[in-house]
C-alpha cells in the first residue's frame, strides 16, 4: 500500500471520529501521538525514544476503558520524559477522544494497515511523507487558522530547488509552520548525496542535528512541525527540544537563533495584532512582515541566500516600508521577484510574491552598500487561471520561471528578457512607467529586468512592479456613480436576506427568523409608511 492510499484510509477514519466531536485539527494532533508510537515500533527505535511500558504494543494490548486510561497516562508520562525531544513532542498534550471504542478503533485500524513495502519495513521518511499528506489534507479541509496560509508544496519545492542547499549549510525558517521548507531542504540535500551516504560521519551528524532550524510561535503547530521533522529523520538540536524551537521571532527568541546560510520562509500574513514585537529593529514598525524582513537580513551569514513569501503591501508600503526596502537593496543583492497568482493560498484573494536575494554580493559577501543592480521580475499572476480544487496549482505552472531563473542559486545565471508562457503574448500592455520606451512585444513578456536606478527614480523604491493588463480588470472611469453602486449592492443584500428568511421558515426555524428580523429592524430602524 503506497502513502497516498494510507493517507486516504487514515483520513476516511476521521469521518467516523467526527461523529464523536473530533475535529480535523484534533484528529491530526491525535494521529501525531499515535504515529510517533507506531513509527518507533516499525523502525525498531522504541528503545531510543520511549520508556519501557509506554510503547505501541502496551497500548494495543488494552481495550475499552483500560486502554483509554492508559493512553491518557501515557501522554502525561511522555510529556514529562527526561528526553527533551520526546518531552517537546508530547508537552501539554491531551486526547480529545472521549469514547473508548473510538480509540480502540483507531489503534486497531492503524495496527492493521500495511506499513510495509514488500519485504522492507517503511523508513522514517515514508512515515514522514504520509504525515505530510495528512497535514495537507488538514489544510485543505480547515481553510482557517494556519491552514489558510499553508504554503503550496509545488512552491516550496521550486524555492528549495532554486536555492540549492548544500551539506553543512544551516537552513532557517523563522516562521516554521509545519516545517515544509525545512523538510524539502533536507529532501533536496539527500537527493544530491545518496541519502547522505556519500557524506562522512561528522557531516551526516551535522545534517541530522544542526543543519535545519525553525522557530514557531504556536505550541500546537510547533508540535506538528517537530513530528514532521522527526518522521523525516531530522532530530535537530536535542538540547533545544528538536529542530523547531518554540518562540517569537520578533522578540529575543529570534535574536538567539543561530546565523543561517539559507532562509526560506512564508511569514504569517495580516496585521501585528496578537504579535508581541519586543525586538529592537533598525526600522521600528508595527508591520510584522516588514519586521520579518529585517530579521532575515540580520540572521543571514554574509553571502547567505534567502527566498521569502511576502504579501503585496511589503512591496509598496511607504514610510518605514520604503526604508526597509532601501536597506534590503543596499545590504543585499535583490535579484529576483516572483509575482505569484492569486488563489494558491486558502485565504482567497491574498496577493503574494517571492523575493530572492543574497546578503552582500557573491564577489564581496561583506558589502553593505549598493548591492542591488538589476532586479528581474517574473509575472505569474496576470491573466493566470483562478486556482483552487478544480484547477490545482502544480509544478508545471512554475517550470517556466525555474527555467529563466537559471541554475545559479544567487541568480547570476545568464538571463535574457522575454518569456511568453500561459498566452502572455495575448495580454494587453498597461499604460505604466514600466512600459515607457519598451518594445511592444517585449512588454507582453512575463520576464522583465528593471535597474536599481529606475526603481529609485521611477518607482520611489516601490517594488510593486507590473506591466501586463489584467483582462478582468475594470476601468475605474467606466464605473457607475458611487450612489448607484451602493443602491445595487443594497438591493442584492435585501434579496439575499429575503431568500434566507424563506429558507429558515422552510426548515422550521421560523422563531429564529423572526428574531433575526427584529435585530435588523433595531439596527436600521423599522421603515414605516
UniProtKB/Swiss-Prot annotation:
A family per Pfam: HsdM_N
EC class name: transferase
Keyword Cytoplasm annotated: no
Binding site for S-adenosyl-L-methionine: 148-153, 178-180, 216
Region annotated Disordered, chain positions: 405-444
SUPFAM superfamilies hit by this protein: S-adenosyl-L-methionine-dependent methyltransferases
GO biological process: DNA restriction-modification system; methylation
Feature: compositional bias, Basic and acidic residues: 407-418
EC annotation from Swiss-Prot or TrEMBL: 2.1.1.72
Alphabetized GO MF terms: DNA binding; N-methyltransferase activity; site-specific DNA-methyltransferase (adenine-specific) activity
Superkingdom to which the source organism belongs: Bacteria
UniProt-listed InterPro entries: D12N6_MeTrfase_N, DNA_Adenine_Mtase, DNA_methylase_A-5, DNA_methylase_N6_adenine_CS, SAM-dependent_MTases_sf, T1MK-like_N_sf
Disulfide bond annotation, renumbered to this chain: none
Catalytic activity as recorded in UniProt: a 2'-deoxyadenosine in DNA + S-adenosyl-L-methionine = an N(6)-methyl-2'-deoxyadenosine in DNA + S-adenosyl-L-homocysteine + H(+)
Gene3D superfamilies xref list: 1.20.1260.30, Vaccinia Virus protein VP39 (3.40.50.150)
Protein's UniProt keywords contain Transferase: yes
Keyword vocabulary terms for this entry: DNA-binding, Methyltransferase, Restriction system, S-adenosyl-L-methionine, Transferase
Subunit structure: The type I restriction/modification system is composed of three polypeptides R, M and S; the restriction enzyme has stoichiometry R(2)M(2)S(1) while the methyltransferase is M(2)S(1).
Family as reported in the entry's similarity comment: Belongs to the N(4)/N(6)-methyltransferase family.
Function (record text): The subtype gamma methyltransferase (M) subunit of a type I restriction enzyme. The M and S subunits together form a methyltransferase (MTase) that methylates two adenine residues of the sequence 5'-GAGN(6)GTRC-3'. In the presence of the R subunit the complex can also act as an endonuclease, binding to the same target sequence but cutting the DNA some distance from this site. Whether the DNA is cut or modified depends on the methylation state of the target sequence. When the target site is unmodified, the DNA is cut.
Family matches, as PANTHER family: SLR6095 PROTEIN, TYPE I RESTRICTION ENZYME ECOKI METHYLASE SUBUNIT
UniProt miscellaneous comment: Type I restriction and modification enzymes are complex, multifunctional systems which require ATP, S-adenosyl methionine and Mg(2+) as cofactors and, in addition to their endonucleolytic and methylase activities, are potent DNA-dependent ATPases.
Protein name from the UniProt record: Type I restriction enzyme StySJI methylase subunit
